[in-house]
Amino acid sequence: MSDYKIWVDADACPNPIKEILFRAAERKALPLVLVANQMIRVPPSPYISQVRVGVGFDVADQYIVDHVEPTHLVITADIPLAALIIEKGALALNPRGELYTVDNIKQKLTMRDFMEDLRGSGVHTGGPDSFSQADKQAFANSLDKWLVRV
């Protein structure tokens, strides 16, 4: 099991997702690393750690990319980061339980870029729906599917 690890792009990760991850790390004795540019509260555990990176654009993302390995799972809502993780052969899961894959990442990037272009031209596109109990459950289910394999 020592080859497996979970990385968290922690600055924007919802607290309920972190709690699920903390419990999973303890239950499976699995390394969990939260990467952020601010201090993140983590429970005392030999399996849970945090890395505080400097402030700057995509500094936490780059740290994760530099350290991820193919047997790792990365939790992120950042689609460009997910694309880089997939390129390195690892898995990326968003906090709403959606697994980013080789098959869907290009479409996700295209849609993200399109929405960014719309916002840049002054069109109000709205944001994602509020994080819900259904999202939390979908994440827990997806994480459990990965944990069964480790």
From Swiss-Prot:
* Signal peptide as annotated in the record: none
Enumerate the CDD domains for this protein: PIN_YqxD-like (cd18720)
- Pfam families for the chain: DUF188 (PF02639)
* InterPro entries in the record: UPF0178
Q: Please, which domain of life does this record's source organism belong to? A: Bacteria
The record's annotation in NCBIfam families points to:
PRK00124.1 (NF001095)
Family membership = Belongs to the UPF0178 family.
Q: What is this protein called?
A: UPF0178 protein Shew185_1764
Protein's organism? Shewanella baltica (strain OS185)
Q: What is the lineage of its organism?
A: Bacteria, Pseudomonadati, Pseudomonadota, Gammaproteobacteria, Alteromonadales
